[in-house]
Amino acid sequence: MNIYDQLQAVEDRYEELGELLSDPEVVSDTKRFMALSKEEASTRETVAAYRQYKAIIQSIDDAEEMIKEAGGDPDIEEMAKEELKEAKAAKETYEDKLKLLLLPKDPNDDKNIILEIRGAAGGDEAALFAGDLLAMYQKFAESQGWRFEVMEASYNGVGGIKEVVAMVSGQSVYSKLKYESGAHRVQRVPVTESQGRVHTSTATVLVMPEVEEVEYDIDPKDLRIDIYHASGAGGQNVNKVATAVRIVHLPTNIKVEMQEERTQQKNRDKAMKIIRARVADHFAQIAQDEQDAERKSTIGTGDRSERIRTYNFPQNRVTDHRIGLTLQKLDTILSGKLDEIVDALVLYDQTQKLESLNNQ
């Protein structure tokens, strides 16, 4: 099926959906009505663009016919040629637009995310860099009008981050931050380095779409839930009532501990959000690993341990190794201005997918 057959099939389905949504039997079935409404909304832009494209094709045919029938009238011929030129330019623009609209939509693109950052190789310096990344994502979220909530964090003795888990909520969060998963390498002179030598350290970032309970159901029998007293600095118990929660998903041994909130229920709710996302992500990663051909068409290898980016402080340089992008503005990027990198990654991903579509 070529691209135009696909577009015609989308339009046919759109018209069918319009009829179904006016059917009293469908209207009375709330669940089905909502599902069909969502499907119709997701194809509306594509259908509108395709109809405009067909109108442009008709304009080309009309202009060519007018040139043939001009009968030597230079004014009519010139006007028709100008219309033909404009219509052909519009045709090219709409062909590119339609190809993009036909690309498979990532069903997670509109979702909120669970963001995890960990200091990895490099000890204290890695933990300090993890803190820099946390601040970078917080500032980027603020610039996008998103809500950024730290759900759980553990720090080392110098104020660096061993591990932090955050929820980022807002419009199209996953679509912009999904490319951030991987190993982020930093090259700089640590404050504790007396010889001025540049050290290399690493922090890892994991971005997972938030998973609602209705989307991914975990069997309660697969969970072990422990309740214990929250502890403060030095390990002392800070609550007389046991409010901290530990949840273990037994089949995968994925574990989440939560003690940030004052009540057991709030800690349990947050822990369930994280474990649901982690378990769903775990099985999604297994499925992705089994689809080698699909992985080759995405940015990077898909390996969570893959080094995706280097932040070189002496050269004020950031390099994204997956797309060969180098920017001499590290200070700007760490201040939360990630748009240039995000836009380049989205464009690269779309280009790769367009090539796959054209090769079909």
Swiss-Prot record:
Pfam families named among the record's database cross-references: PCRF, RF-1
Gene3D superfamilies per the UniProt record, alphabetical: 3.30.160.20, 3.30.70.1660, 6.10.140.1950
Maturation and modification: Methylated by PrmC. Methylation increases the termination efficiency of RF1.
Annotated stretches, region: Disordered: 288-308
Basic and acidic residues bias spans: 293-308
GO molecular function, one term: translation release factor activity, codon specific
Protein name per its UniProtKB record: Peptide chain release factor 1
Organism: Streptococcus equi subsp. zooepidemicus (strain MGCS10565)
Gene encoding the protein: prfA
